[in-house]
Every structure is written in C-alpha cells, then in structure tokens.
C-alpha cells in the first residue's frame, strides 16, 4: 500500500469518526492496521474510534501495541487515561493523565 493510499484511508476514517460512524471508522482502521501493522498514526486513530464506539478494552489494546519512545505522541497517554477510566481502573487512569500533562523537554534544534 502506498503512503498516498494509506493517507486516503486515514482521511476517510477521520470523516467517518467525526460524523457519528465510529464503528465503521474502527473497521476501516483495523483493516489499515492489518495492511500496515504497528503504524502509530493508525493505532492512535483506532484507539480513538474504539473509545467513541464505547469499546474501551479494544482502545486500550490498540494503545498497548504502540511502541513507546521519546517521540511517542502525548495523545496516547490521554487516550489511555480515557480508556482506563471507562474500564474503572482509576489509579492507572490517573497515572496516564499525569504522564499526559507532565512537562515535556524542549525539542533541541537538530
């Protein structure tokens, strides 16, 4: 799959997600994940779609598949906090929210 095709599918999933079709967006993003496994942009969008569809456990599974490193997007922790909260895991949700709001080191010019 070309990068342009992947981008087109992401745009379609975004439109579906923001027009009340979160389940359809999740199906599309699951297919995209099968074609390009481990893509962080896809996994974040998939987690958001699952959260909107009320599937917190599936959202958390998508987030758990992300590779965390220094460049991991902060929104992953926000989505994780939301999923954990919905799963009635308040202590873990609090830690994820603290990680989301924690000060980040400035980017060095490179």
Label for each model-derived stretch:
Residues 5-27:
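Alpha-helical segment of the N-proximal tetratricopeptide repeat
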């Amino acid at each position: 799959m070309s990068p342009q095709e992947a981008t087109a599918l992401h745009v379609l999933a975004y439109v579906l997600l923001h027009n009340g079709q979160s389940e359809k967006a999740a199906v599309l993003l699951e297919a995209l994940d099968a074609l390009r496994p481990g893509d962080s942009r896809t996994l974040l969008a998939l987690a958001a779609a699952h959260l909107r569809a009320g599937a917190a456990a599936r959202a958390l599974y998508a987030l758990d598949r992300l590779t965390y490193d220094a460049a991991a997007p902060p929104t992953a922790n926000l989505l994780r906090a939301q999923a954990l909260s919905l799963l009635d895991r308040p202590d873990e949700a609090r830690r994820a929210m603290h990680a989301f709001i924690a000060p980040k080191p400035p980017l060095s010019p490179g």
